[in-house]
Regions:
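Intrinsically disordered, low-complexity glycine/charged-rich regulatory or linker segments
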Residues: 1-166, 285-378, 382
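Structured alpha-helical segments in the cores of large, soluble enzyme domains
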Residues: 110, 162-176, 189-206
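Conserved acidic residues
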Residues: 121, 170-172, 234
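Receiver (REC) domain switch-region micro-motif
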Residues: 123, 174, 210
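Conserved beta-strand elements of beta-rich interaction domains across eukaryotes
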Residues: 128-131, 179-181, 216-217, 243-244, ...
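Conserved Class I SAM-dependent methyltransferase catalytic core
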Residues: 183-238
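Class I S-adenosyl-L-methionine
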Residues: 221-279
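Long, intrinsically disordered low-complexity tandem-repeat segments
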Residues: 381-406
Length: 414
């Protein structure tokens, strides 16, 4: 698990968006972006070449980049079925892996303890995987009579529900997760994050908690939003759970203990309405949000974000490098089998640590590798047998020569 505490910010936030037609450029982690793009290109080229070879040769191997990607992820089989089996390691089968990711997050950040202080709380699950997040909260809250809002994160629907017609109640816990395609669309990713900021400032209860699943933090607007969160919440964490996919930059922002007084003092909601609300409903494709606040980001703050990018990015690069090396290796089937066995054990250990019931897997012998070993043993036995026969023949020949010499000596003596 990667765990970072974002520095507390006591600045007066000044909303002053910069909106231009130019493409959005990265704000930090330039070298990481370069290396990630480089290795993505290598993977795409290898995958295209493999597809071409498989099309031309129906007997070609079925080991794809996508398959190796699954094998390389250490905790893949907690939620997905183990290859060659119809079972996953965990006996608990939520519809999404976010169930297990949030389980780690709740434990590390002591969110369960905070939630237990109230008998009834208001929870908003703004994710397409809300069935998994609801199941987790029901398990942790022991089916308390909580008020629940569950909506798939559809941009227009979310805007209408929370911005056009603000909620009558304040929300104690927000859980946000975007659509898979939104994370790869930079413009939509930034607009989603601004919408999340609006929702939290407008609807979060005092001392409330928000959890947002995000991706890489490369752009100024995303850093600005983190900077605002560090001002209006007592604590802000960046966490990549160990169970998250190692080949992705996904992580969670955990914002604890909202301070309503800061929002009132800085007139943050009024500033957002005056400067950014129209941007949220503007569907122009030629307008990009490059920045949100007029404050200069302190070096210590940006360096902390950079640190998280470097560590998580290095893990991504190493995982991609491992995928390429396995794919090019002549003994890739053997390497994949070894990795699979090791990762099944890691998944079992994770389940035991988190008190999740798990299935038991008996180690199966690879019949092809076993056959090869048997053939090698047979060949070795045959070689030993041939050597023994040659040795026996040589001994018999030597004995015959000695006998002939003896007879000759006896004749000479006579």
């Amino acid at each position: 698990m990667n765990y970072y505490i974002i520095p507390k910010n006591n600045f007066n936030i000044a909303i002053n968006p910069v909106i231009k037609t130019e493409l959005i450029s990265p704000f930090i982690s330039y070298s990481l972006i370069y290396f990630l793009n480089n290795i993505y290109t290598q993977l795409l080229n290898i995958d295209e070449l493999n597809i071409t070879e498989n099309e031309s040769n129906r007997y070609a191997g079925e080991t794809t980049i996508e398959y190796i990607n699954r094998i390389v992820n250490p905790f893949e089989f907690i939620h997905t079925n183990v290859p060659g089996s119809c079972l996953s390691v965990s006996k608990v089968k939520p519809s999404s892996n976010i169930f297990f990711e949030l389980m780690e997050v709740f434990q590390v950040c002591n969110i369960t303890d905070i939630l237990s202080l109230k008998k009834q709380i208001n929870i908003a699950h703004l994710t397409s995987n809300n069935s998994s997040t609801i199941d987790l909260l029901n398990m942790l809250r022991e089916d308390n009579d909580d008020s629940i809002i569950d909506i798939e994160f559809d941009y227009k629907k979310i805007y209408e529900t929370f911005i056009d017609q603000p909620l009558l109640m304040k929300v104690d816990l927000f859980i946000f997760e975007f659509k898979e395609t939104d994370y790869t669309d930079t413009q939509q990713y930034i607009k989603n994050m601004i919408l999340v900021l609006f929702i939290i400032v407008s609807n979060q209860s005092n001392s409330g908690t928000s959890i947002i699943k995000i991706d890489n933090i490369f752009y100024k607007s995303i850093v600005d939003i983190l900077f605002i969160f560090s001002a209006i919440f007592e604590k802000v964490f960046l966490i990549k759970p160990s169970i998250s996919k190692i080949t992705k930059g996904e992580r969670f922002i955990i914002c604890k203990n909202m301070n309503i007084d800061v929002i009132s003092h800085t007139k943050l909601l009024q500033q957002l309405n005056a400067h950014l609300k129209m941007t949220l409903i503007d569907e122009s494709l030629d307008k990009n949000i490059h920045s949100i606040i007029g404050n200069e980001i302190p070096y210590y703050f940006s360096n902390k974000i950079e640190e998280s990018n470097v560590v998580i990015g290095q893990q991504q690069l190493e995982a991609y490098d491992q995928i390429i090396n396995i794919f090019k290796n002549k003994n890739k089937d053997e390497k994949i089998e070894t990795l699979k066995r090791n990762h099944i054990q890691k998944c079992i250990q994770w389940c035991e640590k988190n008190q999740i019931p798990h299935n038991k897997f008996v180690e199966r012998v690879n019949i092809f590798l076993n056959a090869k070993k048997k053939d090698d043993i047979k060949d070795n036995k045959k070689d030993d047998s041939d050597k023994k026969d040659d040795s026996d023949k040589k001994d018999e020949s030597d004995k015959k020569d000695d006998s002939d010499k003896k007879d000759l000596l006896d004749t000479d003596t006579k």
